[in-house]
Amino acid sequence: QIKIKPAYLISGGASGRNFYNNFNYNFIKIFLIYFSSTVFVIFLYNLIDLRLLDAFNLSFTTISSGGFIPTENLSNILGNNLQIFILSITLLFPIFNFFLLHDIITRKFSFRNYQEDLHIGSLIVILTLLFYFFIIPNEGFTNVFFAITSSLSTSGITIYAPDLDLSFFFILLTIVGGSVISTSSGFKYT
């Protein structure tokens, strides 16, 4: 006779034990990471003089990988390079692993556990520098960085309107960013 174990008893979860037995612990931990990240991003957006409603919507866009733009054109919200750069930095949150910030804060960080994030970070730096210096040197650094992080985070938002059509490359970057673990709910969980 074959015994089938119910899916909720399969071991796993944030602590590596039975997810069902640790559901409350895992739920609270994940909720606090999402909540604190969202509040931190809203705080950052308020520091760079974005309206509260725009900051609220953009924080949901960055944390959950897209979908909450309050206007048709993002350039109506972002007025200077500092705002574009901060938005690009906050787009890095859903690109990297879910517990990366948690492990850094709790001093449990190890490069061995986050090799994929190291590769993605290296890819972002290399592609941004390559595009800025060789492919589209007339475009500003913040716009290039924003286009790369937006594509890799699969959010699909941009203010970049190039003379040179790089749509195919940005679509490939979106595929690469979407194929790394999971971006269906924003943060990546491994």
Q: Where are the regions that the model predicts?
A:
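Membrane-proximal intracellular helices of multi-pass ion channels
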Residues: Q1-T190
